[in-house]
């Protein structure tokens, strides 16, 4: 785990780079952001440390929702109204596209059924080190997988610009790294080089694959990764 000094140093670098890369008026294309929100009951999680209510997610979203890029949100019809209201607070409703999805668990129903079956397998339960981890919840794993489904769906619907970035709805958990929410108040432009970019917390090859699978150590953050 990084120490506080490492985090602060990284944060200072981020702010400096952001100021250099946010070159409005250049030929760089605007980045389209894609996210999703579905209440799968994490507010009732047995582990209090992992518990995240819908209200908490909306508060976390409100911090970064001021970013001025076009934002595509996959969510249910009820949550859509709250999300639109939050973006409207920053005058960004016209740059917000809601894709109402009220049949989340029917989109890949066969896959969800297989995940649920695996989650009940005793060998699976005995193997996992943390029995109450979110990743043991088939609905959580299904929703995680749907990030890629939604990115592809947005592409097929013609909603994306040339550059697209996924942002987790609850990104940064309310200010763990980016303590000043005003740091999100900018239009993000960046000249991606045509590759998929994924930010890793550590070298994934530095640990044994089976160990990572059992302990579910975080390696890839579900935020700010993009492609062009």
Regions found by a protein language model. Give the residues of each.
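N-proximal low-complexity "stem/linker" segments adjacent to membrane-targeting elements
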Residues: 10-56
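Short loop/turn segments at strand-loop or loop-helix junctions that form parts
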Residues: 32-41, 100-104, 167-169, 201
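Short, acidic, metal-binding catalytic loop of nucleotide-sugar glycosyltransferases
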Residues: 54-70
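Short internal beta-strands
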Residues: 72-76
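Short, charged/polar "capping" segments at the starts of alpha-helices
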Residues: 77-84, 206-208
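Active-site-proximal specificity loops/subdomain of glycosyltransferases
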Residues: 92-157
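GT-A fold catalytic core of metal-dependent nucleotide-sugar glycosyltransferases
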Residues: 143-197
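Conserved catalytic core of nucleotide-sugar-dependent glycosyltransferases
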Residues: 173-228
